Amino acid sequence: MADKIIENNQVSMMGKIAAGFTFSHQVFGEGFYMTELLVKRLSDSEDRIPVMVSERLVDVTQDYIGEYVEIHGQFRSYNRHEEKHNRLVLSVFSRELKFVEEEDETVPVNQIFLDGYICKPPVYRKTPLGREIADVLLAVNRPYGKSDYIPCICWGRNARYASAFEVGGHVLIWGTYPEQRIYETDRGK
């Protein structure tokens, strides 16, 4: 099962390591560590993407800040229990990590494919700049009865199309993983 390719959740990205490795957790004696990857957008701005890596893929005691890597893996989520509420934590789970000399234009810089099911009715809205977007929450199944719950944003005509999706509907999504800063607001509470 360890080498089974999970086809419904695939991420490929390349970027520069931007942080040291910090311990996350251990499973059956295997340590997992978090780092951050700076990944360029087409606009040349950069996203800081959290990446989880096994100690079996890389020597986590070394300093690799500034090194370029190519990563293939999955998009994962889990609920972090905080004082009065849960917080959905999103990261890329690296199944393969390869050091590269510099950015290689033949490698997808930031590509994601998800095959899952709609969890909540999509929310269609317009941004303050008038752009149409739809918020979609997708459940992507993985082995052993687990699922990753991944919030997605559809833009433009795709937003109008996605706004009609029904809960339980099967959806295939291709896109990128941009860094998202989510700010909580007081909604009349």
Where do the PLM segments sit?
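Single-stranded nucleic acid-binding surfaces, predominantly the OB-fold ssDNA-binding core
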Residues: M1-K189
